[in-house]
């Protein structure tokens, strides 16, 4: 039974009642030994903390700093802050000194949770710039609090004693929280200036967790590996709480072991994780006995044919242009015949070969939602073809997480899936500002037309904290300009093409989106990093870092990046790879061709 709530505080309270003694979170004690915390314990610890915070003078609506990584103390602290009617201002322990001294004062933080003593030592050096902070609370239960710092466990015990005497201020505060109240202020990275504080209401986050397209229940297990202060991972953890799912705090280093011993049925993930796993699988296959290598390539080749035809039959291939009914029907028949013919062989190799890949990459996974960046096409295809459903989503901090997401029934590779229920998306012309999609004046309502993505709905932020100018730049009449370029496909899925600010305008006046070109070039095993350039030039160029692993496979042994960049044969092979990838056959126009490039000796 899932929990429906209008605020995070209500969610914690109801989850304790509904899910009770079921495991809410698992914390690693040893390699395969986990300490469980059930839903009732999570709420009670949070309520004790909230009581102590209120007793200290924490006001409703106040902003509380929360500098920590994924750990049980994070969710307990967050629970306490939410129950007390306050809003958290989270960041990881890798936060820079510059961000600490900007974010905490800007957010008007008076009380700040810190994960460990090491972070406290950094803060001591910066204290002259953090004069508004009156109280620091150490979270790590294995460390003693330095002088002048409170300890989380002491506050919980203080709150426990107060509650034992009948103190119920935590419940009173929690019930007073309204959906339109602030739940969190998340500061986005300030790559072009100071970080901006995204104000998210309880209603934003609660609506989001109702839209996550995965069916979970009390018997499901999730791994937490993405930074919990990011809205994507945070929304997934709140979703798990609502569903009664058990969440285990893992890490990239322990992921391989945890996929086997926890056997998760769900997890949030990032493209880089799948890229690393993809390369590891390919490296293992390449190093295997020739017979095993043959079986691997044969098995995957059959899976590619089988799934490619199956996706065509189920309308799961991205239609960027309106399909010709006759050609589509003919293709449907041909794919049906091919699918029938390959099924027996695929069935054998699926059990004998592909099952081993699934076991290594998480055979128990019902699905994983990948966010935070675009999945490379070849990686996307590989895992979905071998039978690991990767549901790519698209969103941002300003929208409390996903705007769109694939579902198991709408798993269209190379897209980020359909728009979430209750959310509106429009595609806007970059030059004239006219609505391209949905527009009844345009052919097919504007499907297949490229433009800037704007979004509206209950997931959109209130604005940037104390920064009306930045808010006005991206918000107009409830619509938020994402700054991303995309199109709606003819099977009603969104396809991301790049960033509007990344658009290159050639001397001819042609607008070029570099991201699709860069993503295609990265599919070559010879290219490790690439940046397409060419603003105001006649043609496009590229800055390329050659791949050590890719060239080692071709016999360029014991050579570093600098040596590869100076090697004439490397230059010839990269030129051939560029010509092969950026071609008309792969859907690129003549002005999108890369006519010049430079090999860089380092990243």
Predicted features along the sequence, with ranges:
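Conserved AMP-binding/adenylate-forming core of the ANL superfamily
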Residues: 21, 25-79, 96-101, 151-156, ...
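Conserved pre-ATP/AMP-binding loop-to-beta segment of ANL
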Residues: 21-23, 160-187, 194, 216-221
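Conserved AMP-binding A3 loop
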Residues: 36-40, 183-209
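Structural core segment of the AMP-binding/adenylate-forming
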Residues: 79, 83-158, 172, 576
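Conserved ATP-binding/catalytic segment of the ANL
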Residues: 188, 434-436, 441-506
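Conserved AMP-binding/adenylation subdomain of ANL enzymes
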Residues: 206-224, 228-329, 333-354, 364
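Conserved ATP-binding loop and adjacent catalytic segment of the adenylate-forming AMP-binding
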Residues: 248, 340-347, 354, 358-370, ...
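Conserved C-terminal "lid"/linker of ANL adenylate-forming enzymes
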Residues: 504, 529-533, 538, 579-603
């Amino acid at each position: 039974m899932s929990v429906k709530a209008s605020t995070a505080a209500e969610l914690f309270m109801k989850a304790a009642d509904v899910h009770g003694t079921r495991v809410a979170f698992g914390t690693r004690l040893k390699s395969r030994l986990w300490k469980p915390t059930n839903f009732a314990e999570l709420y009670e610890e949070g309520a004790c903390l909230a009581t102590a915070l209120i007793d200290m003078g924490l006001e409703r609506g106040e902003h509380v700093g929360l500098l920590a990584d994924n750990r049980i103390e994070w969710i307990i602290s967050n629970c306490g802050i939410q129950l007390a009617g306050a809003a958290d201002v989270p960041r990881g322990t890798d936060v820079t000194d510059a961000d600490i001294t900007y974010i905490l004062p800007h957010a008007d933080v008076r009380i700040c949770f810190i994960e460990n003593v090491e972070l406290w030592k950094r803060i001591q050096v910066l204290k002259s710039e953090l004069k508004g902070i009156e109280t620091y609370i150490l979270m790590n239960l294995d460390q003693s609090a330095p002088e002048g710092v409170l300890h989380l466990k002491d506050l919980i015990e203080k709150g426990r004693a107060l509650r034992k005497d009948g103190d119920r201020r935590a419940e009173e505060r929690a019930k007073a929280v309204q959906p339109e109240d602030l739940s969190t202020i998340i500061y986005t990275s300030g790559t072009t200036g100071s970080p901006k504080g995204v104000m998210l209401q309880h209603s934003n986050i609660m609506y989001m967790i109702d839209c996550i397209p995965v069916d979970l229940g009390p018997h499901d297990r999730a791994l937490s590996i993405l930074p919990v202060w990011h809205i994507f991972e945070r929304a997934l953890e709140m979703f798990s709480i609502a569903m009664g799912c058990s969440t285990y705090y893992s890490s990239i280093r322990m992921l391989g072991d945890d996929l086997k011993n926890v056997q998760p049925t769900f997890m949030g993930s990032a493209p880089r994780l799948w890229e690393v796993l993809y390369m590891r699988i390919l490296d293992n296959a390449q190093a295997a006995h020739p017979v095993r290598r043959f079986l691997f390539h044969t098995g995957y080749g059959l899976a590619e044919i089988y799934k490619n035809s199956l996706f065509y039959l189920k309308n799961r291939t991205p239609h960027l242009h309106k399909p010709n009914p006759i050609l589509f029907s003919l293709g449907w028949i041909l794919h049906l015949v091919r699918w029938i013919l390959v099924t027996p062989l695929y069935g054998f190799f699926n059990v004998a070969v592909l099952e081993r890949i699934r076991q290594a990459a998480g055979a128990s996974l019902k699905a994983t939602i990948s966010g935070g960046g675009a999945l490379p096409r070849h990686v996307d295809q590989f895992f979905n073809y071998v039978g690991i459903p990767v549901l790519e989503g698209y969103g941002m901090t300003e929208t409390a997480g996903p705007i769109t997401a694939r579902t198991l029934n709408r798993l269209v590779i190379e897209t980020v899936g359909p728009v979430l229920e209750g959310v509106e998306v429009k595609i806007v012309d970059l030059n004239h500002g006219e609505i391209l999609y949905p527009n009844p004046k345009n052919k097919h309502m504007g499907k297949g037309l490229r433009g800037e993505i704007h979004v509206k709905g209950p997931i959109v932020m209130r604005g940037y904290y104390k920064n009306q100018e930045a808010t006005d730049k991206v918000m107009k009449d409830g619509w938020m300009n994402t700054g991303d370029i995309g199109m709606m496909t003819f099977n009603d899925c969104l396809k991301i093409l790049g960033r509007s600010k990344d658009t290159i305008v050639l001397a001819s006046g042609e607008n070029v989106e570099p991201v699709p070109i860069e993503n295609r070039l990265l599919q070559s095993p010879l290219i490790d990093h690439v940046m397409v350039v060419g603003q105001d030039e006649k043609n496009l160029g590229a800055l390329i870092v050659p791949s050590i692993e890719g060239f080692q496979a071709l016999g360029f042994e014991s050579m570093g990046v600098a040596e590869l960049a100076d090697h004439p044969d490397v230059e010839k092979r990269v030129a051939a790879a560029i010509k092969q990838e950026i071609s008309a056959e792969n859907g690129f126009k003549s002005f999108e061709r890369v006519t010049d490039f430079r090999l860089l000796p380092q990243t």
